[in-house]
Amino acid sequence: MAEPKTKYDRQLRIWGELGQSALETASICLLNCGPTGSEALKNLVIGGIGSITIVDGSKVEIGDLGNNFMVDAKSVGQSRAKTVCGFLQELNDSVKANFVEENPDTLISTDPSFFSQFTLVIATQLVEDSMVKLDRICREANVMLVLARSYGLTGFVRISVKEHTAIETKPDHSLDDLRLNSPWPELKSYVESIDLNVEEPAAHKHIPYVVILVKVAEEWAQHHSGNLPSTREEKNEFKDLVKSKMVSADEENYKEALLAAFKVFAPTGISQEIQDINHDSCAEVGSNSSDFWVMVAALKEFISNEGGGEVPLEGSMPDMISSTEHYINLQKIYHSKAEADFLSMEQRVKSILVKVGQDPSSISKPTIKSFCKNARKLKVCRYRTIEDEFKSPSTTELHKYLADENYSGAIGFYILLRAVDRFAGTYKKFPGQFDGSTDEDASQLKTIALSLLSEMGCDGYELQEELYNEMCRFGAAEIHVVAALIGGITSQEVIKLITKQFVPKRGTFIFNGIDHKSQSLTL
């Protein structure tokens, strides 16, 4: 068997050893192992999830051979849970795999305590009543839940957890934490020791842009009552001031300074989002507070004291044109400041842990260090219960989506994916499931959908007429290509939740295979 670092080399580059460790200790339960569930679990098994338990009471049918790669002709008539479990185990023998041959709807009703043993439950192809019951069970047991369903050419993914906190959110774009407009004493002292008017051309061409911009910002502030540029005109004047320091037109370090000038104009202090997290009621910690909120409480203290209104410094520097000496010196200054901030935070975390009666060493140094490095990018996600969303959706958002042509497909499928469950409850079949009933089923489905819209406070709205016929043509089929996409997105969100890295999707993700669109609805 390959060593973990070799086996998982590529993904370790994405979520690191801490993330991989979280995956390898996680326990996942999958309800229904049709193509959607099998595809979701396949991705997690290959990624090295700790253990899986499949719950499915059905037998493999001939129809399964056309849309599920985790069964074969030899398995027809055998337990689907056992068959899929066996094939998945072959993909990664380090994953513990179990199966339970029972109908998930029955298990939800008869043995709710079963789910408390898992880190996360993936529930696929459940009808509305079962989703509501399972969500209630998982919330009471503090187990994360991801709901997924593929239905013809549409499908959805919906996360349901009380609260999810993420430290390593890894945004696509973020501003380098260089503090060019609020340098601390050591950085200021080093910058002041460098002369921008040095006569030697080679030396002038290798002054890093951090030094150039801090010096020019200081000069600007001296002539503008201590203020930095704020208007477009002032920003252009600032850039002209940078240009005036150039000796020749080919000085790449000054060109870098001009391109990075916007970093001087960035607002100082902390973002509104981080302020909101600091003022969250959970930041008033107690003996049952999570590690995240203990560190937030420490961050709040840090900002008010040694941070001087700022979060801990990240400590990393981007590449830039510079002499080796200047770059290494700057690197040391940034690293030393980040380390000092970390040590201050560590002491505050320990002090708070003692105060609330927890073990002062219960939060590891790497965790605190990661928190400090990502303190500008923290995220707190809270999700409504499925029951709340179904019983009292946001009418403001609903009206907005129904009135917006761009969302007509997504909101239409959202309504109809609920309507087909009501249809099945009334007629004991899904619309279009049997040949020859499409027109009648479409009419009955429309009646149910309009009734549902009325219950949701949306009288007078109509869905696209063709969607009723499309839902009947789907016949509740799980098409493999759609199941693979929905399963892939499901596993992606599961990894985000377990590793606590990246930001999980908010609301209900809807895939519209007819228009080749995917959108999220927050209701």
From Swiss-Prot:
Pathway: Protein modification; protein neddylation. GO terms for biological process: post-embryonic development; protein neddylation. Its main location: nucleus. Disulfide bonds: none annotated. It comes from Arabidopsis thaliana (Mouse-ear cress). Pfam families: ThiF. CDD domains: APPBP1_RUB (cd01493). Coiled coil: none annotated. It is found in: Nucleus. Keywords: Nucleotide-binding, Nucleus, Ubl conjugation pathway. Regulatory subunit of the dimeric ECR1-AXL1 E1 enzyme. E1 activates RUB1/NEDD8 by first adenylating its C-terminal glycine residue with ATP, thereafter linking this residue to the side chain of the catalytic cysteine, yielding a RUB1-ECR1 thioester and free AMP. E1 finally transfers RUB1 to the catalytic cysteine of RCE1. May function redundantly with AXR1 in the RUB conjugating pathway. Seems not to be functionally equivalent to AXR1 in vivo. Transmembrane segments: none annotated. One of its GO terms (molecular function) is NEDD8 activating enzyme activity. This is NEDD8-activating enzyme E1 regulatory subunit AXL. Belongs to the ubiquitin-activating E1 family. ULA1 subfamily. GO terms for cellular component: nucleus; peroxisome. The keyword Nucleotide-binding applies. Heterodimer of ECR1 and AXL1. The complex binds to RUB1/NEDD8 and RCE1. SUPFAM superfamilies: Activating enzymes of the ubiquitin-like proteins.
